[in-house]
């Protein structure tokens, strides 16, 4: 039995996740494996590479840089978040991603993408943190309408949150029976049908299975939340979530807003750190029995 960490996406609500992860790293809290979705995928990699503060640092540094994210990028390239700047210039030069530490960490790391042809989730294990792995992370965070379809091998991929927003059942199926789950919505949140569905239906006319996955995403999401609530109440899994709605834009240009959400994550984690540690110690003890 293995311990896992599951990271929901949510665009810049992911700063909450970044705050939680930095506290976990500072406290030396680790798990056997983790899986990230969308923002959870591109921010969570820094937990495996143990780069405390990197996520909030590069986001606050470049949030006002049009090379990073802008509607100009979207009109010129089809990507709101620049592929070249976000996934090459920043991690390779400006704020280097430590792929060596990522590769040497014993923690398994998975990302979730959505296959646009089938509407199904694709779960990819990132082993080295190399350019191909970063490409999978990019695909996981490529939001419909805001990013081009990412081609990897024979796949056409978009945001993993469409097919599997919180991949608890996937992680259970591969042996992660006791999990920390970081959500980016408060308790009681209920997802509604995507109001952009007519636009998505028109934009992805060639991919009807993907459109249907978008159409019923809210139903699958809410059912997964109910399942997670049951796991939480039974003590099998431990859920970390913001106390109130985070209220931050998908493309946030105010570094103070990014820091506010990040500090909310830190505060929640600091309050709960002893409970988190106790949960994992109990899970590890059970695994040894």
Segments and roles (model prediction):
Residues 1-37, 45-289:
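Patatin-like phospholipase
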């Amino acid at each position: 039995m293995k311990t896992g960490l599951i990271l929901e996406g949510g665009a810049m609500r992911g700063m909450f996740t970044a705050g939680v992860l930095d506290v976990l790293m500072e406290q030396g809290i680790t798990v056997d494996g983790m899986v990230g979705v969308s923002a959870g995928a591109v921010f969570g990699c820094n937990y495996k590479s143990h780069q405390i503060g990197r996520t909030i640092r590069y986001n606050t540094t470049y949030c006002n840089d049009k090379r990073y994210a802008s509607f100009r990028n979207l009109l010129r390239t089809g990507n709101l978040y620049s592929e070249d700047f976000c996934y090459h210039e920043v991690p390779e030069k400006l704020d280097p991603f430590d792929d060596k530490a990522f590769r040497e960490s014993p923690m398994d790391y998975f990302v979730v993408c959505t296959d646009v042809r089938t509407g199904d989730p694709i779960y990819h294990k990132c082993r080295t943190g190399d350019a191909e792995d970063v490409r999978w992370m990019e695909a996981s965070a490529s939001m419909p309408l805001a990013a081009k379809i990412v081609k990897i091998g024979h796949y056409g991929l978009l945001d993993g949150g469409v097919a599997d927003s919180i991949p608890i059942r996937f992680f259970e199926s591969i042996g992660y029976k006791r999990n920390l789950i970081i959500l980016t919505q408060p308790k009681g949140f209920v997802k509604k049908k995507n109001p952009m569905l007519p636009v998505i239906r028109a934009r992805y006319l060639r991919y009807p299975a993907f459109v249907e996955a978008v159409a019923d995403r809210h139903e699958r999401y809410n059912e997964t939340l109910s399942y997670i609530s049951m796991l939480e109440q039974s003590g099998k899994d431990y859920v970390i979530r913001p106390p109130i709605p985070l209220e931050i834009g998908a493309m946030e240009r105010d570094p103070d807003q990014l820091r506010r959400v990040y500090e909310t994550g830190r505060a929640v984690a600091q309050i709960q750190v002893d409970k988190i540690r106790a949960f994992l110690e109990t899970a590890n003890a059970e695994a040894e029995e």
